[in-house]
Amino acid sequence: MIYLTREDWNNFFLPKLTQDNKSFFTELKHIKNIHSIMQYINSKIKISNQIVLSISMIYFHKFYNQTLINLINITPLDKLIICGSCIFIATKSSNHLIRVSVIVNIIMDIIKKKLPNLNIDLDTIKEKIFQKEFQILQSLGFCVNFELPYKFIIKIKNYFESITNISSQILIDSCFQFISDSFLLPISLYYTPNLISISCVKVMKEKFNLVDININDLISLSEYKIDLNELNECYSIIKKLYDKEENITSNSSLSTKVSN
């Protein structure tokens, strides 16, 4: 199964994400590199969208933490194969069927530009993707169905419109970006989609001083029970990620709107 037990989360993941140590940010740096590769591959396929990229990152986190691969030591080719395989599985699980040759050709183009001395052919890349796909599916327990946190943000759009003068679409877009960035962390392996959504809104509320947004109102809109301890826990983890980022206010449209 994709989701983790509370015991696994407490014993292995939570300490890594909450303790003040360099390992968290070192690991995050390498995960960002994986994310960048996935973004590039995703941008080159015709059905490119944020949903596919987010699902890909979920699969990567599960595979990464199940197999304990060392992101520092794996080869650039292995990174490409892992990213391509995660994207390939994600396209299928989101009902976007593409040929594996599409992924293979994108990876080959990257190799030609970034690894020109690497001697490898298309058939070998294809075989490696199929092998890695099976390994990733094993780490997922062959369960690829996963609910993403984006839907709940759309659901509360009317709430945004009722309590603030800020364009609801600006809020929606910003929430989507916060959620998308949160996939750099493995929080999606434990916390529910609605809880992640509310946590991201809570971070956004604090960062942009959106005093009109009441988190309790959002909790009441959720069809699932929201555990307040888990909400604070998830919020703290996401906030830690954004506190580390220097470009937290890079969304100038929102920042300008709020300041006015």
Question: Residues of each region from the PLM?
Answer:
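Long alpha-helical rod scaffolds of large eukaryotic non-enzymatic complex subunits
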Residues: L218-N260
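Intrinsically disordered, low-complexity regions enriched in small/polar residues
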Residues: T5, L14-P15, H61, V144, ...
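A eukaryotic "domain-start" boundary segment
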Residues: M1-Q50, N260
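Structured all-alpha helical bundle cores of eukaryotic regulatory proteins
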Residues: T26-I198, K202-N232
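Short linear sequence elements within intrinsically disordered, low-complexity coil regions
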Residues: D8, L14-T18, C175, K240, ...
